[in-house]
Amino acid sequence: MTYLQEASRNAITVPKLQAMRDAGEKIAMLTCYDASFAALLDRAGVDVLLIGDSLGNVLQGQTTTLPVSLADIAYHTASVARARPAALIVADLPFGTYGTPEDAFRSSVELMRAGAQMVKLEGGEWLADTVRFLVERSIPVCAHVGLTPQSVHAFGGFKVQGKTEAGATQLMRDSLAVQQAGAQLIVMEAIPTLLASDVTKQLRIPTIGIGAGLDCSGQVLVLHDMLGIFPGKRPRFVKDFMHGQPSILAAVEAYVAAVKDGSFPGPEHTF
């Protein structure tokens, strides 16, 4: 089966992402939930595959990511890992699985055993001790700041973050704190472009934007969104790369090319 073939390019590792950032090469990231798509995305040149808790929305039909369990993420991580992609495999820690450093470690071990090479946690300054605890135990960490979907009820909906002076200051503090704690990657979601640019300049680690402007070290989208598979209104930061393309592979290749050459996101995709 094609999804069990060995990857034909050099592996993307955590140090490789840092080298890409330092060299000014943009990082293309997409969500992925199964072996077949893992093989296709890898063939298209995607650098990072994220087993996101967004699977709750796009696979399970949930209205939020909160119902997604650790077992759900582990199952889909194992499915992606079986494709043996060259792309780095990052797995989300779901809501309620990292309340303490010890909880986060136990949850991360399960995902790493399933095939993850890095785990992603939502939170900033308050999460620094947990990030440090994981990194000290050889678990690479991606932090997620800005609009963190697991906090949807605390935010009162899916709203742009960092728009006020206080909010921007806190987001900068959050980003610096998780970097200082040892995070090797950070996702910034739905924040003003200028703020994302400032944070990217202040940090030494790669920043991955989703609705955070062009100046981030890379971009991420939910796979279904960039293929035009979204019920209802299209999110502002999403572009339908499937439109006008002859195949899914061509659409993903177009996404990778647009991220790499800086043509995505455009002003219409940012805040």
Swiss-Prot record:
It comes from the Bacteria. GO terms for molecular function: 3-methyl-2-oxobutanoate hydroxymethyltransferase activity; magnesium ion binding. Its EC number is 2.1.2.11. One of its GO terms (biological process) is pantothenate biosynthetic process. It catalyses: 3-methyl-2-oxobutanoate + (6R)-5,10-methylene-5,6,7,8-tetrahydrofolate + H2O = 2-dehydropantoate + (6S)-5,6,7,8-tetrahydrofolate. The active site is at E189. Mg(2+) binds at D53, D92, E122. Binds 1 Mg(2+) ion per subunit. Keywords: Cytoplasm, Magnesium, Metal-binding, Pantothenate biosynthesis, Transferase. GO terms for cellular component: cytoplasm. 3-methyl-2-oxobutanoate binds at D53, S54, D92, K120. It is found in: Cytoplasm. Its cofactor is Mg(2+). Pathway: Cofactor biosynthesis; (R)-pantothenate biosynthesis; (R)-pantoate from 3-methyl-2-oxobutanoate: step 1/2. Belongs to the PanB family. Homodecamer; pentamer of dimers. NCBIfam families: panB (TIGR00222), PRK00311.1 (NF001452). Catalyzes the reversible reaction in which hydroxymethyl group from 5,10-methylenetetrahydrofolate is transferred onto alpha-ketoisovalerate to form ketopantoate. This is 3-methyl-2-oxobutanoate hydroxymethyltransferase.
